[in-house]
């Protein structure tokens, strides 16, 4: 299951615009860019632990909502249920994109993961954490703080990984372009020598 081509292209263009380092003139290490692994171990470990933590967060949130449901105003009941449903759906998509983008070094998927984390998931969990009208219980605050720490770390780690991936892809592109030009020059020399012989 892959992202549709228009979405992949837009996320790829967005990633190149945001994460490319225009000040760099060459690769940072002596290894060839084809052999360098740019997926992030820290990000992958965070995604792994987040995968096991999220069901715990979900069950705790549902239990706490059940306990305080009768004292919440009607509009907060609707808002909290909607936010928990949104977080659940977004988290499933976000973790999938994070795994695929990081392990397979796919920039559009990792950019989608980063955008979902930063623009949707983080504001929703901060709403649950800091809204005084929700009368958060101590367990709720604890699980929301841990989830927020996961998200904050993943946003930073994904940004750094994306920068590294985009820079590596740019180096690969320039090396392939250089190889093509070198091959074309070699062909031109051979043609000139053949013409001169004739």
Curated annotation (Swiss-Prot):
Pfam families: Transmemb_17. The keyword Membrane applies. It comes from the Eukaryota. Glycans are attached at residues 13, 23. The chain crosses the membrane at residues 45-65, 78-98, 110-130, 142-162. InterPro entries: Uncharacterised_TM-17. GO terms for biological process: cilium assembly; non-motile cilium assembly; smoothened signaling pathway. Part of the tectonic-like complex (also named B9 complex). Transmembrane component of the tectonic-like complex, a complex localized at the transition zone of primary cilia and acting as a barrier that prevents diffusion of transmembrane proteins between the cilia and plasma membranes. Required for ciliogenesis and sonic hedgehog/SHH signaling. This is Transmembrane protein 17. It comes from Homo sapiens (Human).
């Amino acid at each position: 299951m892959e992202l549709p081509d228009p979405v992949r292209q837009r996320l790829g263009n967005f990633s190149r615009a945001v994460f490319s380092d225009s000040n760099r003139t060459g690769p940072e290490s002596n290894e060839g860019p084809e052999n360098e692994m740019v997926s992030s171990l820290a990000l992958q470990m965070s995604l792994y632990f987040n995968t096991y933590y999220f069901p715990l967060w979900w069950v705790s949130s549902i239990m706490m909502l059940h306990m305080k449901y009768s004292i919440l105003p009607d509009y907060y009941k609707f808002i909290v249920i909607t936010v928990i449903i949104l977080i659940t759906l977004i988290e499933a998509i976000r973790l999938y994109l994070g795994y695929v983008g990081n392990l397979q070094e796919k920039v559009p998927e990792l950019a989608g993961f980063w955008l979902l984390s930063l623009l949707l998931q983080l504001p929703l969990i901060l709403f649950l954490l800091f809204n005084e009208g929700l009368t958060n219980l101590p367990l709720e605050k604890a699980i929301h703080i841990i989830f927020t720490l996961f998200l904050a770390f993943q946003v930073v780690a994904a940004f750094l990984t994306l920068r590294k991936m985009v820079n590596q892809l740019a180096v690969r592109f320039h090396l392939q372009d250089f190889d093509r030009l070198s091959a074309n020059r070699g062909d031109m020399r051979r043609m000139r020598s053949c013409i001169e012989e004739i």
